[in-house]
């Protein structure tokens, strides 16, 4: 199975947010975007353009800690999210070192990039890469993108972000200035001892936590339903 990666050359990004608009259209999350929740978005800063998106870590903390396995890592390298399994516990929000997952309080779900796994599976590029007008975003096989990032970095004296942070990611950012100076989170570099995959099983403590949280969710839903019924009854009286 081929692994893929995205290469973002910040020196070509003009902050037009075509990537964000195209992403909204692709996944039809206009309501969430209206609340300021995005799968990807570019913030313009003096030192560079900070593009907030999932970094698709080699060993994602969100996947390792999700109690119900709503987050998994595909063999292609993407960190995927299953909203049907999600119980809204926000563990991923707390555990992500890159501060990526955003919680939709109304839907009780999270919002994050999937690297357009559905498009990649069809042989297409992610929507954001396809629409980028300046070529700031590139997509390809992991080793190819990594090699290209190193080559461009050496040639133009650019910083590389995402190659070693948190043990490595599937998103490489090239920038003239230190990426952490214009929005990217400072994350410690570390070696990967074990890759997390979709076949990884849930540990016993995690399974127990899943049952507990699941019970709490049912209790909360029942309480909300009862309160709604009581309010409806009072309004009729």
Regions found by a protein language model. Name each.
Residues 1-237:
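Non-ligating segments of multi-cofactor redox enzymes
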């Amino acid at each position: 199975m081929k692994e893929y990666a995205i290469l973002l050359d910040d020196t070509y990004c003009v902050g037009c947010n075509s990537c964000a608009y195209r992403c909204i259209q692709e996944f039809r999350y206009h309501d969430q975007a209206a609340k300021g929740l995005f799968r990807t978005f570019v913030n313009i800063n003096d030192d560079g353009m900070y593009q907030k998106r999932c970094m698709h870590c080699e060993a994602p903390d969100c996947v390792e800690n999700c109690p119900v396995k709503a987050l998994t890592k595909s063999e292609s390298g993407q960190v995927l999210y299953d909203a049907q399994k999600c119980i809204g516990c926000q563990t991923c929000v707390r555990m992500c070192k890159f501060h990526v997952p955003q919680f939709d309080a109304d839907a009780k779900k999270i919002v994050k990039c999937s690297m357009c796994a559905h498009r990649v599976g069809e042989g297409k590029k992610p929507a954001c890469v396809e629409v980028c007008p300046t070529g700031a975003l590139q997509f390809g096989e992991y080793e190819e993108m990594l090699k290209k990032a190193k080559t461009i970095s050496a040639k133009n004296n650019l910083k590389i972000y995402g190659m070693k942070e948190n043990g490595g990611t599937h998103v490489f950012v090239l920038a003239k200035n230190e990426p952490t100076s214009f929005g990217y989170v400072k994350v410690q570099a570390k070696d990967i001892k074990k890759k997390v995959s979709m076949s990884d099983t849930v540990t016993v403590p995690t399974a127990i936590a899943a049952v507990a949280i699941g019970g709490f969710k049912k209790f909360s839903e029942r309480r909300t339903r009862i309160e709604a019924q009581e309010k409806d009854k009072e309004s009729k009286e």
